[in-house]
Amino acid sequence: MDELPPEQIQLLKKAFDAFDREKKGCISTEMVGTILEMLGHRLDDDMLQEIIAEVDADGSGELEFEEFVSLASRFLVEEDAEAMQQELREAFRLYDKEGNGYITTNVLREILKELDDKITAEDLDMMIEEIDSDGSGTVDFDEFMEVMTGE
């Protein structure tokens, strides 16, 4: 549960409590599809059953709050990653002025300096060398993503 920010956990608690009509501290796994749809995720029955089986570890047919958070966090974290990739794609496009699918290592150097004004020239050189392993002097979007996300 530690990968979600407290405000998201509070939001999930409100949603959970709304579905926990009998105030038993758990909700029926039958509600999972409805909840995921409210979060903007429509899943087919097979996928839904697979997720429920994974999350309802004790097979009770009910989800305790921790199980519910575990389920919801998969979707929330995924969306955050997608949103971040979209933002990085936009940023890359801004720097790729010619629209040719890459930026120069000099441009990347400027971006990295803007993000971290304490970075040394040596660190920058090492990073650029690692990223531009073929020595082409250019960085494509995938390489840019790798630098920005560390993945």
Curated annotation (Swiss-Prot):
Example GO molecular function: calcium ion binding
EF-hand domain sequence ranges: 7-42, 43-78, 83-118, 119-151
Pfam families in UniProt: EF-hand_7
Gene3D superfamilies in the record: EF-hand (1.10.238.10)
PROSITE patterns noted in UniProt: EF_HAND_1, EF_HAND_2
Residues given in the record as Ca(2+) 1 binding sites: 56, 58, 60, 62, 67
Function: Troponin is the central regulatory protein of striated muscle contraction. It consists of three components: Troponin-I (Tn-I) which is the inhibitor of actomyosin ATPase, Troponin-T (Tn-T) which contains the binding site for tropomyosin and Troponin-C (Tn-C). The binding of calcium to Tn-C abolishes the inhibitory action of Tn on actin filaments.
Keywords in alphabetical order: Allergen, Calcium, Metal-binding, Muscle protein, Repeat
Protein known as: Troponin C, isoallergen Bla g 6.0101
Annotated residues for binding of Ca(2+) 2: 132, 134, 136, 138, 143
Cellular component, GO annotation: myosin II complex
